[in-house]
């Protein structure tokens, strides 16, 4: 028989840097989980991605055990790295802060593909391009499917 789920916890933690201080400690402590056990497992699983902000979905069971899934970094962070900017524009429609091309968008879309609800790479590229525009980045060049 499968374990009964009591809830989920979503967090964004830097790879290899989980520790019991906020935000990790209070979020897991309120569910009654062993915080140090999570930190050890998370750090071991993400030691190859140090300093990269990673979303994690923790499934909490009635016996206070847990499973977690580490997802790919947010598209906004990958776009900021590609455009070499610190953060997006406060007014994305007026003030442009950088530029990305379709090759960079394809690379990011391929990285994000497991976490996106898209079947085709073109659909994933459109999602990433939309995120780029909402950050105040211009998408240079012509889309590959608009020949």
UniProtKB/Swiss-Prot annotation:
One or more lysine residues are methylated. GO terms for molecular function: large ribosomal subunit rRNA binding; structural constituent of ribosome. Coiled coil: none annotated. GO terms for cellular component: cytosolic large ribosomal subunit. It comes from the Bacteria. One of its GO terms (biological process) is translation. Disulfide bonds: none annotated. SUPFAM superfamilies: Ribosomal L11/L12e N-terminal domain, Ribosomal protein L11, C-terminal domain. It holds the Pfam family Ribosomal_L11. InterPro entries: Ribosomal_uL11 (IPR000911), Ribosomal_uL11_bac-typ (IPR006519), Ribosomal_uL11_C (IPR020783), Ribosomal_uL11_C_sf (IPR036769), Ribosomal_uL11_CS (IPR020785), Ribosomal_uL11_N (IPR020784), Ribosomal_uL11_N_sf (IPR036796). Keywords: Methylation, Ribonucleoprotein, Ribosomal protein, RNA-binding, rRNA-binding. Part of the ribosomal stalk of the 50S ribosomal subunit. Interacts with L10 and the large rRNA to form the base of the stalk. L10 forms an elongated spine to which L12 dimers bind in a sequential fashion forming a multimeric L10(L12)X complex. Forms part of the ribosomal stalk which helps the ribosome interact with GTP-bound translation factors. Belongs to the universal ribosomal protein uL11 family. This is Large ribosomal subunit protein uL11. It comes from Cytophaga hutchinsonii (strain ATCC 33406 / DSM 1761 / CIP 103989 / NBRC 15051 / NCIMB 9469 / D465). The lineage of its organism: Bacteria, Pseudomonadati, Bacteroidota, Cytophagia, Cytophagales. The gene is rplK.
């Amino acid at each position: 028989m499968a374990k009964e789920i009591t809830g989920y916890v979503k967090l964004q933690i830097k790879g290899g840097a989980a520790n019991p201080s906020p935000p990790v400690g209070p979020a897991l402590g309120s569910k009654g989980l062993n915080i140090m056990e999570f930190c050890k497992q998370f750090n071991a699983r993400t030691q190859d991605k140090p300093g990269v902000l990673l979303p994690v979905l923790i499934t909490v069971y009635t016996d206070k055990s847990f499973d977690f899934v580490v997802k790919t970094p947010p598209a906004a962070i990958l776009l900021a790295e590609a455009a070499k900017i610190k953060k997006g524009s406060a007014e994305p429609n007026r003030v442009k802060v950088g530029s990305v091309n379709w090759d960079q968008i394809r690379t990011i879309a391929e990285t994000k593909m497991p976490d996106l609800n898209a079947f085709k790479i073109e659909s994933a590229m459109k999602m990433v391009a939309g995120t780029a525009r909402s950050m105040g980045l211009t998408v240079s060049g012509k889309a590959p499917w608009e020949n």
